[in-house]
């Protein structure tokens, strides 16, 4: 009985150390890409692996908590985070939804990429296989069950996968990754176009 208890304790300590090393390594790599732009190609699958949809566009991220996510195909949409609020714009229906940043991404692992709040890491488990890191939520009520980030040899983010709690998942492949994009100063500012309805949920 004592041997089993000791073995269990050793395994627990070992697994905790592996998690700590993986989380620390991931945090270090993310800190190295505090600003980047890229093109993305998204493929959405159902829980059985059947392809449901494809999309593509441009992504710009500046930590902490600023990003510009512009989907250009098959339909245009825009998500802009200015550090405080998140704006979700659908040109087709001429409506924009405004959300508090903490409400929009706090309960998703994406906050680990966009943000720099170290206290949030305690809500997730991190495992590592080579340059692939899997971030799993400890909260069973979250919409996103896990988030997988893949880095290339230059430590650029080459891909990330999002698995929802219901089983549907999306894979995002990044190309034209640029750590030094030229900013004009308005990339993370959203101005409501004339005639567009505002759904303010802040």
Swiss-Prot record:
The keyword Acetylation does not apply. The keyword Signal applies. It comes from the Bacteria. Keywords: Chaperone, Periplasm, Protein transport, Signal, Transport. GO terms for biological process: lipoprotein localization to outer membrane; lipoprotein transport. GO terms for cellular component: outer membrane-bounded periplasmic space. It holds the Pfam family LolA. SUPFAM superfamilies: Prokaryotic lipoproteins and lipoprotein localization factors. InterPro entries: LolA/LolB/LppX (IPR029046), OM_lipoprot_carrier_LolA-like (IPR004564), OM_lipoprot_carrier_LolA_Pbac (IPR018323). Residues 1-20 form the signal peptide. It is found in: Periplasm. Participates in the translocation of lipoproteins from the inner membrane to the outer membrane. Only forms a complex with a lipoprotein if the residue after the N-terminal Cys is not an aspartate (The Asp acts as a targeting signal to indicate that the lipoprotein should stay in the inner membrane). HAMAP family: LolA. Belongs to the LolA family. Monomer. This is Outer-membrane lipoprotein carrier protein. It comes from Aeromonas hydrophila subsp. hydrophila (strain ATCC 7966 / DSM 30187 / BCRC 13018 / CCUG 14551 / JCM 1027 / KCTC 2358 / NCIMB 9240 / NCTC 8049).
